[in-house]
């Protein structure tokens, strides 16, 4: 709804042993759910009513970042977020004699999510670099609205490697893996060569 909304914006970092950083971020704020935001959410969306602005009174994240040797970096993190009017995509559709029509319905509810993850990256000069990331999510919504979680991520993982082929030319390989609450396996695979 309308009115004054307050949210924290606090970031604390503690550096130790020169290459390790422990951090705590406590953030929040509002996010306008306009046409651009909905289109980024899903290009096949339809809504039955105007989407309310999403309000996050708490988005807390704690973690440890480190670079113990040259070229190697890792991060361990966990967090908890509460969002009022969180966006949820749901699969919808209808059948006619001529065709089947499928689209993404967008609904809203209060969403709470706890998450934890790890990220590891390594780079050797300009010759090769790679990264591996993985995050697990545990979502909660208002009782009776669990169906809204069908497309929210339960696990996201990705792998990327870039290697120098010749001077000023690199080959890039990305692999993205996504597990939703009702879709057990989905993956995206990209191969790009750039100059």
Segment roles from a protein language model:
Residues 3-7, 11-195:
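Exposed, low-structure sequence patches enriched in small/polar residues
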């Amino acid at each position: 709804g309308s009115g004054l909304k307050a949210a924290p914006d606090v970031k604390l970092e503690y550096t130790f042993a020169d290459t390790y950083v422990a951090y705590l971020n406590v953030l929040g704020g509002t996010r306008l759910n306009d046409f651009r935001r909905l289109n980024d959410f899903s290009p096949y969306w339809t809504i039955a009513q105007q989407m309310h602005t999403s309000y996050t009174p708490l988005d807390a994240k704690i973690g440890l970042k480190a670079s113990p040797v040259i070229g190697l970096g890792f991060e361990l993190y966990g967090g908890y977020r509460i969002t009022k009017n969180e966006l949820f995509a749901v699969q919808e559709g209808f059948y006619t004699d001529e065709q089947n029509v499928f689209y993404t319905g967008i609904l809203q509810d209060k969403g709470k999510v706890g998450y934890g993850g790890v990220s590891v990256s390594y780079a050797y000069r300009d010759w090769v670099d790679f990264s591996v990331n993985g995050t697990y999510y545990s979502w909660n919504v208002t009782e009776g609205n669990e169906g809204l979680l069908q497309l929210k991520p339960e696990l996201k993982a990705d792998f990327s490697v870039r290697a120098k082929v010749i001077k000023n030319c690199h080959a890039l390989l990305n692999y993205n893996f996504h597990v939703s609450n009702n879709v057990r396996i989905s993956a995206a695979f990209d191969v790009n060569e750039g100059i």
